[in-house]
From Swiss-Prot:
Glycans are attached at residues 196, 599, 638, 762. Residues 1-19 form the signal peptide. Residues 27-103 form the Inhibitor I9 domain. Keywords: Autocatalytic cleavage, Glycoprotein, Hydrolase, Protease, Secreted, Serine protease, Signal, Zymogen. Pfam families: fn3_6, Inhibitor_I9, PA, Peptidase_S8. This is Subtilisin-like protease SBT1.5. Residues 107-617 form the Peptidase S8 domain. Coiled coil: none annotated. It comes from Arabidopsis thaliana (Mouse-ear cress). Residues 20-103 form a propeptide.
Length: 775
């Protein structure tokens, strides 16, 4: 049979595949037992291709092969093909592809990273020198000064990566700063057909801007002067200014395809990166169906830290993505910088707004006619309220400021539509869901964004002015005030930042932390204007963007600094240091606020809090986790042996793991339990944790407890005495609830924390208790 497969394989090499273009086929990622390859096949590629040749349909071609973080291949298959492959004795799993999407300066200073400090994280880590951060994104614009290699030493000897040259990306585009650049489009082209190279680059070059922006946040060099359209003037710098960068382009016009993302993980690990930064996400699925979770496990198994964006689905609950416990999941917070652009109404009222519009402004001494898109005649109301394409009547918009509701199309696109229809300016109003969270945009006309309450105020003014015969027609102007520093309160949890609880494993608190993600200045390509709309002919070396996409590379860069300062720390130890030293108060000394509501935020919004780089360098204790600990976690999550092999490439003894504990006993730096309560009763559980001393020898840590409301919490022992650095000690946390009666379907979440303190360091872990009364 093997000889027949090999002969058939030779035939298929010269036969074009039709299944890739079949409307009934999808891309699948196939996990194979690579040890089972028959000796007759010279490579795994030959073996995989011969297996495909045995399928009933026209034999498909392989898109990617994987041999580092995952063993197998991806191919375009019909559901019948996929089912047939799953019956193959050496096929472990067949995973349908998911299409992911992007989660789209002053932040180093806000984080306390100053190049002038003589004894800080930057100095201790030599600014991240010789560590390589792999950025899986939309590529890179290598000519930007953020990627200049002046002053850097030779490329690290360990580096095995390449700079893939093309017509628009010469090999010389890489240097001692940008040490590698690759692109992966097989999955994209398998679904969409051959790329249109007039609209995007078939190379590592960035045609979107997102990848250039995130790469420079993580490791851009110091650049002065830096600004965009006159805003945020100052020094631009990444978190790890001397770290090296490798760009892995996986995102294209229609999205980021799992088969390409997994290929990027596979290649990045083989190339020798130290940190992987991923500002991409999709729908939460079980980990064994999640290509990002699978790729990330393969990376951390090799000692590579993986930072991933939490998503921009906030402020609603259960919106967090990239939730596997071996990834560090990053939400977004604000910094102490703002770009006020306020609306002055004809009745004298001022409405706060933000904008980074940099063109000719409105006449400050003049008031302009004001209209609401949703009340214009001739439209359907809904479309015109959102200022969608084709919804506005130029005769009713020309020469006026137009109020548009946020949603459906991008904020910058709304401005382009208003401008095309003759509008002089635009105000974007948040809806109830977005609340008061504001994002500054580089608009193509004078424009600003206001919160939900401000939008209501403006609509009310327009309505009352239009109805009153005695009053004048509604008017307004926009007053641009430039850049404002020292904003209080800050940080605040950004409105868009995705929230917990963790929809896949509520016992693992996600997001882990938040980092700067609102109105972040970073490098930008020449391909596209700062607004992102195609008609924007302005060009700038830097741009201001917002999203957890921007927060993630902050943590990626910080991880590189910590890895450089502590080369022996594992990815879990680095995450533990970030989590247990995070803070939850703002620069006014008050609990961090939720931007969307103006109320106090919670652990479901920020995880353990906002990262504190200086304290993370010296956390005292860390909660370390091995690959086998994660396997036990998966066993206790009731994953099958096949599921676990798909993720970890290892066989699992789940009988032993399940006897040893429960899913909450993963040695994570936070604690979360979900009680399913039936009637009025007391509930209890316990957590077992082990901490490693990375502080001082002969140190003693004592416990401090703030129990969640309605619970009793004890810790045994109450004191941990360490004789040496590297010593490990264990403790048990016991949680008991009081009798609480909930109505059917109700959920009650209470939070507290435990702190191990040696008098100098506070090792803080949040403790979350969730009570659910089933229907």
């Amino acid at each position: 049979m093997a000889f027949f497969f090999y002969f058939f394989f030779l035939l298929t090499l010269s036969s074009p595949s039709s299944s890739a273009s079949s409307s009934n086929s999808l891309t699948y990622i196939v996990h194979v037992d690579h040890e089972a390859k028959p000796s007759i096949f010279p490579t795994h590629f030959h073996w995989y291709t011969s297996s495909l040749a045995s399928l009933t349909s026209s034999p498909p071609s392989i898109i990617h092969t994987y041999d580092t973080v995952f063993h197998g291949f991806s191919a375009r298959l019909t559901s019948q093909d996929a089912s047939q492959l799953l019956d193959h004795p050496h096929v472990i799993s067949v995973i349908p592809e998911q299409v992911r999407h992007l989660h789209t300066t002053r932040s180093p200073e806000f984080l306390g990273l100053r190049s002038t400090d003589k004894a800080g994280l930057l100095e201790e880590s030599d600014f991240g020198s010789d560590l390589v951060i792999g950025v899986i994104d939309t590529g890179v614009w290598p000519e930007r000064p953020s990627f200049d290699d002046r002053g850097l030493g030779p490329v690290p000897i360990k580096w095995k990566g390449q700079c893939i040259a093309s017509q628009d990306f010469p090999e010389s585009a890489c240097n001692r700063k940008l040490v590698g650049a690759r692109f992966f489009c097989g999955g994209y082209e398998a679904t969409n057909g051959k790329m249109n190279e007039t609209t995007e680059f078939r190379s590592p070059r960035d045609s979107d801007g997102h990848g250039t922006h995130t790469a420079s946040i993580s490791a851009g060099r110091y650049v002065f002067p830096a600004s965009t359209l006159g805003y945020a003037h100052g020094v631009a710098a990444g978190m790890a200014p001397k770290a090296r960068l490798a760009a892995y382009k996986v995102c294209w016009n229609s999205g980021c395809y799992d088969s390409d993302i997994l290929a990027a993980f596979d290649t990045a690990v083989a190339d020798g990166v130290d940190v992987i930064s991923l500002s991409v996400g999709g729908v939460v699925v079980p980990y064994y169906l999640d290509a990002i979770a699978i790729g990330a496990f393969g990376a951390i198994d090799r000692g590579i830290f993986v930072s991933a964006s939490a998503g921009n689905g906030g402020p609603g609950a259960l919106t967090v993505t990239n939730v596997a416990p071996w990834m560090t999941t990053v939400g977004a917070g604000t910094i102490d910088r703002d770009f006020p652009a306020n609306v002055k109404l004809g009745n004298g009222k001022m409405i706060s707004g933000v904008s980074v519009y940099g063109g000719p402004g409105l006449d400050p001494g003049r008031m302009y006619p004001l209209v609401y898109g949703g009340s214009l005649l001739g439209g359907d109301g809904y479309s015109s309220s959102l200022c969608l394409e084709g919804s506005l009547d130029p005769n009713l918009v020309k020469g006026k400021i137009v109020l548009c509701d946020r949603g459906i199309n991008s904020r910058a696109t709304k401005g382009e539509i208003v401008r095309k229809n003759g509008g002089l300016g635009m105000i974007i109003a948040n809806g109830v869901f977005d609340g008061e969270g504001l994002v500054a945009d580089c608009h193509v006309l004078p424009a600003t964004s206001v919160g939900a309450s401000g939008g209501d105020e403006i609509r009310r003014y327009i309505s009352e002015s239009s109805k009153s015969r005695s009053s004048k027609h509604p008017t307004a102007t926009i007053v641009f005030k430039g850049t404002r520093l020292g904003i209080r309160p800050a940080p605040v949890v950004a409105s868009f930042s995705a929230r917990g609880p963790n929809p896949e494993t509520p016992e693992i608190l996600k997001p882990d932390v938040i980092a700067p993600g609102l109105n972040i200045l970073a490098a930008w390509p020449d391909r596209i204007g700062p607004s992102g709309v195609t008609s924007d002919n302005r060009r700038t070396e830097f741009n201001i963007l917002s999203g957890t996409s921007m927060a993630c590379p902050h943590v990626s860069g910080l991880a590189a600094l910590l890895k450089a300062a502590h080369p022996d720390w594992s990815p879990a130890a680095i995450r533990s240091a970030l989590i247990t030293t995070a803070y939850t108060v703002d620069n006014s000394g008050e609990p961090m606020m939720d931007e969307s509501t103006g109320n106090t935020s919670s652990v479901m919004d920020y995880g353990s809090g906002h990262v504190h780089p200086t304290k993370a360098m010296d956390p005292g204790l860390v909660y370390d986790i091995t690959s086998y600990d994660y396997i036990n976690f998966l066993c206790n999550s009731n994953y099958t042996r096949t599921n676990i092999v798909t993720i970890t490439r290892r066989q699992a003894d789940c009988d032993g793991a399940r006897r040893a504990g429960h899913v909450g006993n993963l040695n994570y730096p936070s604690f979360s339990v979900v009680f399913q309560q039936y009637g009025e009763s007391k509930m209890s559980t316990h957590f077992i944790r082990t901490v490693t001393n990375v502080g001082d020898s002969d140190s003693v840590y004592e416990i401090k407890i703030r129990p969640p409301r309605g619970t009793t919490v004890t810790v045994e022992p109450e004191k941990l005495s360490f004789r040496r650095v590297g010593q490990k000690l264990s403790f048990v946390v016991r949680v008991k609830t009081t009798e609480v009666k909930l109505s059917p379907g109700a959920t009650n979440v209470e939070t507290g924390h435990i702190v191990w303190s040696d008098g100098k360091r506070n090792v803080t872990s949040p403790l979350v208790v969730t009570l659910q009364q089933p229907l």
